[in-house]
């Protein structure tokens, strides 16, 4: 997955519009963002995740179809979805009757980029999450590093 292009701090402010319906809750149950919004699906770990894949959430048919087809969330699709959920679903599924359950729209592209960056700042990237067990073994070395991201950045350049 590519690094988000938005401003996470600005996205935190824009997320105030989203928290009426959505929350970001870590796997351990810690609420990272949002209040009591349960109308919309949880948004933790969205990058690289299949649409409609959070358990115990009543998704619409169109978004479930995308998840079943093997699609995964990325920044470009997120931007299109939040700009117009129904249009996105019709385009992606090819079903002219597809309808998004999310009625709110965020057509401002900069704000959408910022929200994506904010959501990504709250959850590990898919590659980082998969590498977590190996990272535990290297914990003593990581403790000596100036910044946790430096080893990954150096490794990515090779």
From Swiss-Prot:
The record's function comment reads: Cytochrome c2 is found mainly in purple, non-sulfur, photosynthetic bacteria where it functions as the electron donor to the oxidized bacteriochlorophyll in the photophosphorylation pathway. However, it may also have a role in the respiratory chain and is found in some non-photosynthetic bacteria.
- Region span, Disordered: 129-158
Tell me which residues bind heme c.
18, 21-22, 102
Care to name a GO molecular-function term for this sequence?
A: heme binding
Tell me the compartments it is located in: Periplasm
Return the Gene3D superfamilies for the record.
Cytochrome c-like domain
Native organism: Fuscovulum blasticum
Post-translational modification Pyrrolidone carboxylic acid, affected residues? 1
Tagged with keyword Transport = yes
Which terms are listed as keywords in the entry?
Electron transport, Heme, Iron, Metal-binding, Periplasm, Photosynthesis, Pyrrolidone carboxylic acid, Transport
Q: Which domain of life is it from?
A: Bacteria
What does the entry's PTM section describe? Binds 1 heme c group covalently per subunit.
Q: List this protein's GO terms for biological process.
A: photosynthesis
Q: Which GO terms describe its cellular component?
A: periplasmic space
Q: What is its main location?
A: periplasm
Q: Which family does it belong to?
A: Belongs to the cytochrome c family.
What's the protein called, per UniProt?
Answer: Cytochrome c2
């Amino acid at each position: 997955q590519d690094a988000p292009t938005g401003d996470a701090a600005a996205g935190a402010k824009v997320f105030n519009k989203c928290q009426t319906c959505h929350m970001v809750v870590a796997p351990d149950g810690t609420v990272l963002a949002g209040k009591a919004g349960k109308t919309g699906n949880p948004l933790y770990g969205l990058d690289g995740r299949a649409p409609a894949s959070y358990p115990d959430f009543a998704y619409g048919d169109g978004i479930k179809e995308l998840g079943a087809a093997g699609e995964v969330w990325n920044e470009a699709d997120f931007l299109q979805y939040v700009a117009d959920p129904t249009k996105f679903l019709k385009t992606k599924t090819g079903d002219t009757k597809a309808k998004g359950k999310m009625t709110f729209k965020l057509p401002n592209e900069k704000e959408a980029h910022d929200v994506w960056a904010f959501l990504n700042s709250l959850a590990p990237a898919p590659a980082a999450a998969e590498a977590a067990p190996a990272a535990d073994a290297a914990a003593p070395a990581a403790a000596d590093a100036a910044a946790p991201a430096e080893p990954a950045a150096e490794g990515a350049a090779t």
